[in-house]
Regions:
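Membrane-embedded alpha-helical segments and adjacent helix-loop junctions characteristic
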Residues: 59-138
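Hydrophobic alpha-helical transmembrane segments
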Residues: 8-12, 34, 105-109, 182, ...
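Hydrophobic mid-bilayer segments of alpha-helices in multi-pass membrane transport proteins
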Residues: 10-19, 27-49, 70-76, 216
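Alpha-helical transmembrane segments of multipass membrane proteins
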Residues: 14, 18, 36-43, 119, ...
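Hydrophobic transmembrane alpha-helices that form the pore/transport pathway of multi-pass ion
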Residues: 106-193, 204-210
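Transmembrane helix-loop junctions at the membrane interface of multipass transporters and ion channels
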Residues: 201, 221-236
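Short, amphipathic, aromatic/basic-enriched membrane-interface segments that mark the entry/exit
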Residues: 1-7, 94-102, 117-119, 207-217
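Interfacial loop-to-helix junctions that mark the boundaries of transmembrane helices
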Residues: 1-7, 26-32, 56-67, 178-186, ...
Length: 236
């Protein structure tokens, strides 16, 4: 089938169905996901001429891909909960703000560095669930805390959760990690600076951002180059 604007829109529709139902109608993920799956099957059958055999094959492939991803997710969550039960996560979260009395730097340490660390070892909402309450405890209002925690770890998603997203990317595209890793690593490395700058802006305003800009550049460089080195050396 020829690829054009219509086929592109049709292929995008199942994703839009899920987003509209979750964001617009406040459906839960399971209901919205089921509706998106039904939409995908109907579109494949009615518009892309996919027969029962092809649809069954794609569903089986999707299940196998999901099991591969779930294996990584369960391992990552086991690692996080083990560290959490040992008190390591709470200890890190409480100790980091003691390094500085500067409000903006405290926001960076918890909302950017600590949240990124949590994304790397756990992910799946853990950075926000852990970092946001710590930020509120430091005196930030709840909106600031959630925004900093959500944005601060955004750059680390691809290689976070023990590289779950990156493994999924390889599985779905069929491309080798050696080909995908360099470009994704440096693009996300640049995003690390942006995430840090936004967290500093939310925490301390423009003055806080300008005052903490050297720290953002130094810490962002350490994280970005470390991620790139690990990615290109296949440590995912």
């Amino acid at each position: 089938m020829e690829l054009n604007l219509l086929t592109w829109i049709l292929a995008l529709l199942p994703v839009l169905v899920v987003l509209i139902l979750m964001l617009g109608f406040k459906w839960g993920g399971s209901r919205a996901g089921a509706a998106g799956w039904i939409a995908a099957v109907l579109i494949a059958w009615l518009f892309f001429a996919a027969g029962p055999r092809l649809i069954a094959y794609t569903q089986a492939k999707a299940v196998l891909l999901s099991l591969d991803v779930l294996y990584i997710i369960w391992t990552a969550l086991l690692l996080y909960h083990t560290a959490d039960e040992a008190g390591a996560v709470r200890m890190i979260g409480v100790s980091l703000p003691r390094l500085t009395a500067d409000r903006t730097m405290q926001g960076l340490l918890i909302g950017w560095l600590f949240a990124s660390f949590l994304q790397g070892m756990g992910g799946f909402g853990v950075p926000v669930a852990v970092a946001a309450p710590l930020l509120v405890g430091l005196g930030f209002n709840p909106v600031q805390a959630v925004v900093m925690a959500c944005i601060g770890h955004g750059w680390a998603v691809n290689y976070g959760s023990l590289a779950t997203s990156f493994q999924t990317l390889m599985a779905v595209t069929g491309l080798p990690g050696e080909l995908l890793a360099p470009d994704s690593a440096w693009l996300l490395g640049l995003s690390a600076y942006v995430c840090g700058a936004i967290v500093a802006l939310v925490a301390g305003g423009w003055r806080g951002l300008l005052r903490s800009l050297p720290a953002v550049l130094v810490l962002g460089s350490v994280m970005a180059f470390s991620q790139y080195a690990l990615a290109v050396n296949r440590l995912w």
